[in-house]
Amino acid sequence: MSLKEEVESRKTFAIISHPDAGKTTLTEKLLYFSGAIREAGTVKGKKTGKFATSDWMKVEQERGISVTSSVMQFDYDDYKINILDTPGHEDFSEDTYRTLMAVDSAVMVIDCAKGIEPQTLKLFKVCRMRGIPIFTFINKLDRVGKEPFELLDEIEETLNIDTYPMNWPIGMGQNFFGIIDRDSKSIEPFRDEENVLHLNDDYELQEEHAIRNDSAFAQAIEEFMLVKEAGEEFDNDALLNGELTPVFFGSALANFGVQNFLNAYVDHAPMPNARQTNEEVEVSPFDDEFSGFIFKIQANMDPKHRDRIAFMRVVSGAFERGMDVTLQRTSKKQKITRSTSFMADDKETVNHAVAGDIIGLYDTGNYQIGDTLVGGKQKYSFQDLPQFTPEIFMKVSAKNVMKQKHFHKGIEQLVQEGAIQYYKTLHTNQIILGAVGQLQFEVFEHRMKNEYNVDVVMEPVGRKIARWIENEDDIQDKMNTSRSILVKDRYDNFVFLFENEFATRWFEEKFPEIKLYSLL
């Protein structure tokens, strides 16, 4: 198979949603239908002892939530699919944002009872900013929810995107009978004991069935015909341009509508895209020279070995295990001998990968999030990945002073993951950690105890705003006050931590020569 044919067979996407919309469950069922796993677990499995394949971390299994992006690869038909299940919780949106930099399309999961929720809206905006095509899966049709037209209107009005229903539900909740498939004009029943039914060209039922006289069926047919008459033919270019989202109705937990979605996804989703660099060079996935970038680092995927994996998206050329690459940030060459693919925490050695593939590189501390790797003499670096400005800050120390070595190792590795941000006071070297939300600190504390055997003491700093400094040479000691604590971040940049907006404005008025800025 040629490089071009290999690249064209890749599909790489992330699943995004508000917490509890069914994102991780959908991931499980996609793996199940592809044959990648024999049994689909469920995130509700805290009581049963069964956990989602993508929720591999201990804290995820205990809480039944996703707090880190999982990477999984599987084959389906003639395609190789890379799927990234992202954290739904808003406190971990930075990890999700970085993950969205590594995919070519996204699947938006919506709870039919709740519609568009805040986290869904935030993540959709990132996809739109990046020009990522979006597929929509409206979930939990076997429960009572909003009417289909109401959901479509909400998507179109809130997200400013056209919708194209690929199927249409018959009933809802306890009266949910199934879905009408738009292309085949067939009815897929929700219950296994029912057979597939077919519609003729006039959308009349061809088989004899009791549902023929059901009011829910009559209403669904009427709505379906309105959709057909009002809508145009499916426009794949509009999808790829982010102007239209194909909509699928189903129930991930019940294994219903998932395979229909997967079949349509591989038909319509884009192949790997070209990538922009800081030097304004566009790198084609078909370029012969290998290139890739690190978008995620994860420590302790195997707690027994304290390993560290750097996740790399291949952008161009072919990766071969054992090849020499250059880390652009340091200009140092290295031979990559340990590379792996994933089914959550299950790993398999990767000898070959092409554009669109996500592979794990064993990391001894060489890599940082955003690093560019190249196989030839390329001089470019891919565009930087987003970093958020924290809103909560805590002083952190080890409860047991004899555990300092483990404490500092844990801090170093979890900070390098991007799970939490690191600061240090100038004169006392007090460690201060910053996070977007409180749950990040809870997960940090849990992981320090379970992965590094260190109990930590955390104390609020009383600061809510971090601002970086453009002109660091103008900083003076008198600026380090009770209202404006001066610290350094992990890259040795100066940062002021302020109590509130009032303190920030007071500082800017008192020291107008200092130019402050925030991250995302």
Curated annotation (Swiss-Prot):
Keyword Kinase: no
Family matches, as SUPFAM superfamilies: EF-G C-terminal domain-like, P-loop containing nucleoside triphosphate hydrolases, Translation proteins
Domain tr-type G stretches: 8-277
Alphabetized GO MF terms: GTP binding; GTPase activity; translation release factor activity, codon nonspecific; translation release factor activity, codon specific
Pfam families referenced in this protein's UniProt entry, alphabetically: EF-G_D2, GTP_EFTU, RF3_C
InterPro entries: EF-G-like_DII, EFG_III/V, G_TR_CS, P-loop_NTPase, PrfC, RF3_C, RF3_dom_3_sf, RF3_GTP-bd
Annotated binding of GTP, by residue: 17-24, 85-89, 139-142
Superkingdom as given in the UniProt entry: Bacteria
Keywords on record: Cytoplasm, GTP-binding, Nucleotide-binding, Protein biosynthesis
Biological process according to GO: regulation of translational termination
Compartment(s) of residence: Cytoplasm
Any one Gene Ontology cellular component term annotated for this protein: cytosol
Family from the record: Belongs to the TRAFAC class translation factor GTPase superfamily. Classic translation factor GTPase family. PrfC subfamily.
Function summary: Increases the formation of ribosomal termination complexes and stimulates activities of RF-1 and RF-2. It binds guanine nucleotides and has strong preference for UGA stop codons. It may interact directly with the ribosome. The stimulation of RF-1 and RF-2 is significantly reduced by GTP and GDP, but not by GMP.
Protein name: Peptide chain release factor 3
Gene responsible for this protein: prfC
